[in-house]
Amino acid sequence: AILLVEDSVRYYSTYLPELYKLILKQSAEFLKETLNEQQRKGRKRSRPKILLATNLDDAMIFYEKYKNNLLGVISDVGFVRHKEDSPDKEQLDAGIELVRYIRKDDPLMPVLLQSSQDAMSAVAQELGVGFIRKWSKTLMIQLGEYIKEEFGFGDFVFRDAERIEYGRASNLKDMEYLVKTIPDDVLIYNTSKNMFSKWF
């Protein structure tokens, strides 16, 4: 699952179709590899779901319920704490509180913060999470690139700790070959970051 935390109808109406497109594209790629009809049906049923939370309480509930199956989290910085709160009670750092909670529980969980405030970029960097500016003309491109890179969509890219690329697998045959040929330290780095489970 992907957890989207956003209280603006405008933004979640923009994000949801893009997320669905990425999921369907990834599912189609995986379906090319399945061997029989039963496996194909299983893959279709197991494609990631998108969980939409519009307040901090729901975000925490979704995180706790699905954390073992989350590919990542995309969160606004400011939103209300409780479902029944009016918009004027928006907590300007609710997203930061959520990120700290998630990081304490799972330091490897990919998280993307989004805000219209440029200053939040430094906060995201300090927290070790991605950041996109809401008003950016390339918002959807940045969102797609982050998801492909961090949520395990697209090719599996073997990188070392310095982010140097050692190989790219677009299917299981490529993966099998690369696992046998890349340096051991690169393989260990990728397994220690829990990257395989997201791609498979």
Across the structure, where does each feature detected by a protein language model lie?
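Conserved acidic segment of CheY-like receiver
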Residues: 1-10, 15-40, 50-52
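Short acidic, S/G/P-rich loop/turn micro-motifs used as interaction or catalytic elements
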Residues: 8-12, 57-58, 78-85, 117-120, ...
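Short secondary-structure boundary/capping segments
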Residues: 18-22, 90, 127-131
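Acidic, metal-coordinating helix/loop segments flanking the phosphotransfer/catalytic sites
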Residues: 30-72, 79-82
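CheY-like receiver
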Residues: 59-65, 101, 142, 146
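Short amphipathic alpha-helix used as the core "switch/output" element in two-component signaling
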Residues: 61, 82-108
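A short, hydrophobic beta-strand element within the central beta-sheet of small alpha/beta folds
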Residues: 73-75, 96-120, 132
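Long, compositionally biased intrinsically disordered regulatory segments in eukaryotic proteins
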Residues: 116-200
